[in-house]
Amino acid sequence: MTEHWENLNALTAPLLTWYDLNGRTLPWRSVVTPYRTWVSEIMLQQTRVSAVIPYFERFMAELPDAAALATVPEERLLKLWEGLGYYSRARNLQKAAKVIVSDFGGELPRKCAALKTLPGIGDYTAAAIASINFGEPVAAVDGNLLRVAARVSGCADDIMDARVRKQFTAHLNDAIDLARPGAYNKAMMDLGATVCLPNGAPKCEICPARMMCEAYKNGLTEVLPVRAKKKARKIEERTVLLLFQNGKAALRKRADTGLLASLWEFPSVLGNLDEAGVSLALAQMGLSAKSIEPAGSAKHIFTHIEWDMKGYFADVTGENDDLFWADAAAFDAAAIPTAFKKFAALVRARLQ
């Protein structure tokens, strides 16, 4: 199928007309600053808009600028981020904030190239900040824009291929409205998020690109965009130990690197253990169980791995230097990953 890149240029004017009437009302758009755009875009990576809104508002209330973000204790930062997942995003935000304060006078740099020198800011985020806040005509190319562009142009190449993404970026940069680059990027984001939907369910009847869209004209909306299949996730069985001693619950700090780095978790062991296995695992930790009872099961899906978890409550005696015994206040202050959300609620209900 022949690509029709000129369709992207033809889309620009009707797209902006559509956006002026249908653009989403979002908290980071009601009050627009480079800092707010930056934080919102980082939060929106891998996370739905509806889920981000309350986190964004809470974050802004406590950390309204780069100076506040640069100096907040990491434990508090991770607690504010709790539930959003991908905690390296929060750590990179703080690393970048420290550079912004030390090297840029507390204000984000105005150019895309300079923004990309900051930790955690890649091509897409830099383009979003630079276009929305400073009027730089650069396309913020993410999955939404690639999907729209692939369908409108009829490009059947793999959008996950770096060379193909570079080609799309060049054509989108050519199509961007020079007078309203920020509005163009937001319009494409909104079109992809609300109309040109993934998984074969686009709302073509209300799409401003309908008359120039190759996928619509050729019945290919369920085929485009083309993307290589992801590798199957590894499934890992884990037994989660919800331990209590003297009215406190056991937490353990994860390693400083890797998955869920530096966050608090419940002790766990690989495998699907029964009560006898739990008793043995506790003995290997230097603990003895006075009682053991099932605490249900939970599942959590990461990008490349899936945890199938079974939990047990246990009242224990003994000591283990890797464990921190948290009362209710300390438990509430700890940053515990969403992976353990179900178990955290069960533990919290038992703490006085």
What are the functions of these language-model segments?
Residues 1-25, 30, 193-352:
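Intrinsically disordered, low-complexity, charged terminal extensions of DNA damage-control enzymes
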